[in-house]
């Protein structure tokens, strides 16, 4: 009797930092930290205001208005909790394109403008913490 083996797809690897693009926001390439310790993804935004079911914000000096898909209470690494507006937008990472829910917050004091959390990468990628920029510039080792 032959047993049917369940095969899992081989997922592409990500480095712990990657270049991503958000076409809807016309961002060009941005460096994102791939953060398996964070459930949600986050994007640096300024002058954030929610008006009805829309959210207005500035990113890299450009004004944007997108559909608000919700708000999420986030406890940051420094222990503070805040409610952040959330958008859904396309993320381009190398040859991969996918929709992701992203919270908006002031990340001006952070090293990179964007975090990609577990919800965005789950089932799509595996993270290789010894590498960076696997899908973009020449790959680097840690």
Language model features with spans:
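Pepsin/retropepsin-fold aspartyl endopeptidases
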Residues: 1-142
